[in-house]
């Protein structure tokens, strides 16, 4: 990176301070004080738009794993005892109620009291379990969590790995028999392979490799990176293809700006964790292409990120919370990789939008969706998909990346 392209210390420190305050005084404070359940344990599955918790709501493995990951990562990075306490609360509930003691892996959904409601074994949820458990091990050294993460990895590789075409069967029943319907939700295309699931397998395997650098895991992680470069990333457009058949033939024309910018930094993180220097230039090229395409096509005049371009070419201009969070990290990452100041300015712009429109200054946390005119939708603050992972992780990543930039400035 050219030193002439680094913003001055004042700008870097100001952004870092704002991000730190948002993380500790809004996001994590909300989750630590407004969402834990003193009756059933763990965390509630729903908080309404009015901020009222619904302790009897069903609980999803994805939300609970994301809560565990967020507080474990916050404790590891910031050292605040409360964050360890919250992570341990999430860990205890997750292991007690989501883990299938008979067949292994984690259930899709349980009741508040822990009774299984949906026993599917979706690879997306298994991946978040690995991601969270390996982070808890990173933060505390807990060996039981690492053993559980490894067991889930083994189950994925045994029952879901496609040794012919690459990638993974995405959904199984409780006993790990493949399911025909692999969709995460009703809005997904009815196709057997998706970018989304494979992105989060890659994310999880990279975190597991940090604490368990095993040869087979390295090979599987490298195969995932190469799958993205070969089939999922489209070099002609700078976007990710979202859905495929079993042979990785495209079955989608939609564009997800949030996933594009998220993948732009997760792919580089994975190749760096793996230490694959020969593969890195190709990943960096794809990463910067994804970031440039997002900047050119997905950014609104106010600096925020539009949601997506649908299958029929319609631009969805709503501002969902998670693409804004991923844009903060992705644009900072693109700046660190390229030295091009327009990426740093894009990160500042999306942060300004977050502070002015996406965060809820009265009720806490962030609005799930905001209209093009700046008005928030009356969506739940916490639900099956809305957790502290995207915005919490974005803040943790930004703090760390800004620290590195400040060190670079001081060393000049």
Swiss-Prot record:
Keywords: Isomerase. Optimum pH is 6.3. Its EC number is 5.1.3.11. The keyword Nucleotide-binding does not apply. Gene3D superfamilies: 1.50.10.10. GO terms for molecular function: cellobiose epimerase activity. GO terms for biological process: carbohydrate metabolic process. It is an enzyme of class 5 (isomerase). Optimum temperature is 80 degrees Celsius. It catalyses: D-cellobiose = beta-D-glucosyl-(1->4)-D-mannopyranose. The keyword Isomerase applies. Belongs to the cellobiose 2-epimerase family. Catalyzes the reversible epimerization of cellobiose to 4-O-beta-D-glucopyranosyl-D-mannose (Glc-Man). Can also use lactose, epilactose, mannobiose and cellotriose. Highly specific for oligosaccharides linked by the beta-1,4-glycosidic linkage. Shows preference for lactose. This is Cellobiose 2-epimerase. It comes from Rhodothermus marinus (Rhodothermus obamensis). The gene is ce.
């Amino acid at each position: 990176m050219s030193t002439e392209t680094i913003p001055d210390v004042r700008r870097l420190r100001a952004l870092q301070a704002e991000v730190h305050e948002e993380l500790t005084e809004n996001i994590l404070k909300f989750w630590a004080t407004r969402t834990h359940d003193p009756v059933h344990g763990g965390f509630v599955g729903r908080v309404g738009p009015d901020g009222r918790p619904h302790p009897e709501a069903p609980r999803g493995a994805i939300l609970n794993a994301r809560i565990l990951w967020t507080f474990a990562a916050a404790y590891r990075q910031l050292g605040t005892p409360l964050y360890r306490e919250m992570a341990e609360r999430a860990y205890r509930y997750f292991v007690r109620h989501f883990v299938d003691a008979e067949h292994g892996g984690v259930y899709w959904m349980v009741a508040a009291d822990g009774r299984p409601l949906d026993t599917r074994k979706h690879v997306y949820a298994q991946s978040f379990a690995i991601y969270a458990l390996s982070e808890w091990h990173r933060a505390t050294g807990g060996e039981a969590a690492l053993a559980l993460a490894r067991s889930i990895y083994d189950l994925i590789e045994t029952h879901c790995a496609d040794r012919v075409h690459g990638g993974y069967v995405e959904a199984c029943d409780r006993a790990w028999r493949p399911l025909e319907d692999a969709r995460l939700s009703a809005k997904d295309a009815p196709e057997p392979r998706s970018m989304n699931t494979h992105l989060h397998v890659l994310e999880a395997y990279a975190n597991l490799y940090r604490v368990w650098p095993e040869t087979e895991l390295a090979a599987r992680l490298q195969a995932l990176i190469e799958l993205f470069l070969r089939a999922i990333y489209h070099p002609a457009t700078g976007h990710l293809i979202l859905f495929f058949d079993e042979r990785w033939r495209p079955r989608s024309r939609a564009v997800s700006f949030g996933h594009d910018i998220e993948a732009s930094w997760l792919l580089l993180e994975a190749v760096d964790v793996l230490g694959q220097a020969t593969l890195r230039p190709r990943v960096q090229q794809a990463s910067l292409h994804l970031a440039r395409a997002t900047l050119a096509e997905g950014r609104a005049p106010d600096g925020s990120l539009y949601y997506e371009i649908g299958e029929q070419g319609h631009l969805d201009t709503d501002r969902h919370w998670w693409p804004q969070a991923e844009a903060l990290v992705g644009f900072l990452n693109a700046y660190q990789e390229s030295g091009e100041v327009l990426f740093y300015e894009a990160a500042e712009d999306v942060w300004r939008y977050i502070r002015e429109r996406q965060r809820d200054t009265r009720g806490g946390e962030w609005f799930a969706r905001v209209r093009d005119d700046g008005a928030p939708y009356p969506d739940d603050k916490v639900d099956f998909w809305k957790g502290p992972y995207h915005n919490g992780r974005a803040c943790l990543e930004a703090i760390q990346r800004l620290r590195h930039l400040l060190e670079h400035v001081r060393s000049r």
